[in-house]
Amino acid sequence: MIPTMTSAGWAPGVVQFREYQRRWLRGDVLAGLTVAAYLIPQAMAYATVAGLPPAAGLWASIAPLAIYALLGSSRQLSIGPESATALMTAAVLAPMAAGDLRRYAVLAATLGLLVGLICLLAGTARLGFLASLRSRPVLVGYMAGIALVMISSQLGTITGTSVEGNEFFSEVHSFATSVTRVHWPTFVLAMSVLALLTMLTRWAPRAPGPIIAVLAATMLVAVMSLDAKGIAIVGRIPSGLPTPGVPPVSVEDLRALIIPAAGIAIVTFTDGVLTARAFAARRGQEVNANAELRAVGACNIAAGLTHGFPVSSSSSRTALADVVGGRTQLYSLIALGLVVIVMVFASGLLAMFPIAALGALVVYAALRLIDLSEFRRLARFRRSELMLALATTAAVLGLGVFYGVLAAVALSILELLRRVAHPHDSVLGFVPGIAGMHDIDDYPQAKRVPGLVVYRYDAPLCFANAEDFRRRALTVVDQDPGQVEWFVLNAESNVEVDLTALDALDQLRTELLRRGIVFAMARVKQDLRESLRAASLLDKIGEDHIFMTLPTAVQAFRRR
């Protein structure tokens, strides 16, 4: 059995190498070779999405592969350039750099450093719970919005036209006005690459489709001299490895990048943890969210110091490694070795990659992000879930990638507050043949105890729902068909309380007392009891009206 890695200090990845089993080697080697073949063209493509030279994608890949293998808690996750962070990088930096390519590169590296520092500090502060900030509907809608923005950003690349604008609607409008100037050789090449990628995915899912498609396009361009006919190629790529260094940036630029870096950090971390948990669950492993924060932080710092840009997890590369048999992060180290070999000895081949082929690769990746089956699933489950997903997509398209991320987080929080502010509640009764007390709405045959209302409010009590709780509890009393003598609050769901909620509880007790109704509480856990004591409510309610179980509360009512 593979041991879980829930806690291994700052380097949980070391455990997998310390306990490495020889039978895993074949799968890890195959996964490393496959992921490297996938990563090289993908990293170059995402660098262009970020607004940087293709080589920057390779630079941003090297150090994170090694660092995550040691510091990450997932044995499957692949770290490197990815679509969402690349798009956000472009959205943040394009207005700041104003066409200055050198300044753009410096800002990109600085952004990576800031994202890394924020994640590292958050991990040290044990803020791993932030991984739950995005609900499923918001995540589905957000990824669909990101996909559409990715496609719009590549319209010029795959058609050979000049597309202006930095946002979805401006790019689509610009493309629509220049569609008659499509460079057909470029467009045909891009569509051919896209078709080949689609066929490989369907008929040979384990094959490294991106490198096969891009190499095929490169051979076609070289054999037919298509670059002389207007098909753009990557051009010269510096051979060798990047020299680490701190980007020379001003204090003003640092201030301007802090908030965008926080947004990218949230996306990077939440995407990584969600992906890592999904794949870890398949093998009965655990993922330490705080370790993931620290690992992703260190990876981004390293990417910034090696002239890269913010990096994140890749679900596609992770899935590929898992499918071909990768069992540990040794596959990432093997992929790293191949990337280094290519950069040192085969930069001339990379220079011949057609830009249109890289653009087609981005479009292909974007199309895979749009999960129509999930939209249908949301629609079947609850209409409000579907509307939340569509609203998130609209926010990304209308507000841009960065503010769309903030809107996505805000929508998740608002959805959470909506549920907390107006949760399910119930009046409990006895059901013949079933032990305990149950919701009378679920069991029409349930029998209530005359004169007794047993009420349950299914959420922690806090400022967001304090007034809702008080109002609905009184409504239950008002709607009772008989003369209410006792009101018992079943507090099993109300362990967490704040002072606002306890004030509302006291107001409810006071109003019931004014009506001649006894207020009591059942299933009161020790934490709640201590909170009641701290708020001076325990004495007001009375120890004789605080019960450990519902049966003892009902028995006390009957003995009154």
From Swiss-Prot:
**Induction of this protein: by what?**
A possible member of the dormancy regulon. Induced in response to reduced oxygen tension (hypoxia). It is hoped that this regulon will give insight into the latent, or dormant phase of infection.
- The STAS domain covers 442-557
Q: Where in the cell is it found?
A: Cell membrane
Protein name stated in the entry: Probable sulfate transporter Rv1739c
Describe the function of this protein.
Expression in E.coli induces sulfate uptake during early- to mid-log phase growth. Uptake is maximal at pH 6.0, is sulfate-specific, requires E.coli CysA and the transmembrane segment but not the STAS domain of the protein.
Record-linked Pfam families:
STAS (PF01740), Sulfate_transp (PF00916)
Report the record's Gene Ontology biological process terms: sulfate assimilation; transmembrane transport
Q: Which SUPFAM superfamilies match?
A: SpoIIaa-like (SSF52091)
Please tell me where this protein is predominantly located.
membrane
- What CDD domains has UniProt attached to this entry? STAS_SulP_like_sulfate_transporter
Q: Region labeled Required for sulfate transport in E.coli — which residues?
A: 1-436
| Gene3D superfamilies registered for this protein in UniProt | STAS domain
Q: List the membrane topology term(s).
A: Multi-pass membrane protein
The entry lists its GO molecular-function terms as: guanyl nucleotide binding
The parts of the chain that form a coiled coil are none
Q: Which InterPro entries match?
A: SLC26A/SulP_dom, SLC26A/SulP_fam, STAS_dom, STAS_dom_sf
Family classification: Belongs to the SLC26A/SulP transporter (TC 2.A.53) family.
The record's keywords, sorted A to Z, are:
Cell membrane, Membrane, Sulfate transport, Transmembrane, Transmembrane helix, Transport
Chain ranges passing through the membrane:
29-49, 51-71, 79-99, 105-125, 138-158, 184-204, 207-227, 256-276, 333-353, 355-375, 394-414
Originating organism: Mycobacterium tuberculosis (strain ATCC 25618 / H37Rv)
GO cellular component term of the entry, any: plasma membrane
